[in-house]
């Protein structure tokens, strides 16, 4: 029998003066059995740092290869912001960058650089990369 997801609960106060975002988030984040704790923490931090109306974790979890791990949609369902975690492949980034705004939050910056080195990625210069030092995570 396969192990199920572990649910982690976080209460995080978000205060961003520049964007006028002041929220207390009560998050219940599911950790897939194959997901490492550092990746879960980066995913949770990415959600908080990118927080805005319409943000949501992927409903399909790690198995949803066609969806962003975190995405921001407008009220009509239009994708506004695709948020990747870790070190996604260049092919995935190429596809995601055509969808709208793309950000990557990573604790695996060296691996991310290896994945994209010499590859063609649509609007590569517009991709926002937010690296976390491994010692921080």
Predicted regions, residues:
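Nuclease-adjacent, charged terminal/linker segments that flank catalytic cores
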Residues: 1-11
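Acidic-basic catalytic patches of nuclease active cores, encompassing PD-(D/E)XK
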Residues: 16-61
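Conserved catalytic cores of phosphodiester-cleaving nucleases, focusing on short active-site segments
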Residues: 70-72, 77-93
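Short active-site oxyanion
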Residues: 77-82, 100-103, 126
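Catalytic beta/alpha-barrel core
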Residues: 82-86, 104-106, 130-131
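A short acidic, amphipathic alpha-helical/loop segment
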Residues: 92-96, 115-118
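Domain-level recognition of nuclease-like catalytic cores that cleave nucleotide substrates
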Residues: 114-137
């Amino acid at each position: 029998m396969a192990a199920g997801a572990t649910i982690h609960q976080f209460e995080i106060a978000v205060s961003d003066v520049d964007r006028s975002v002041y929220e207390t988030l009560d998050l219940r984040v599911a950790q897939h059995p194959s997901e490492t704790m550092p990746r879960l923490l980066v995913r949770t931090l990415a959600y908080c740092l990118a927080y805005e109306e319409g943000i949501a974790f992927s409903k399909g979890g790690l198995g949803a290869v066609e969806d962003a791990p975190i995405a921001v949609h407008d009220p009509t369902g239009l994708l506004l912001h695709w948020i990747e975690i870790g070190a996604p492949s260049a092919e995935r980034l190429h596809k995601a960058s055509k969808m709208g705004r793309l950000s990557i939050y990573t604790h695996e910056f060296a691996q991310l650089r290896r994945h994209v080195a010499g590859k063609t990625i649509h609007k590569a210069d517009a991709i926002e990369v937010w690296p976390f030092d491994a010692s921080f995570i």
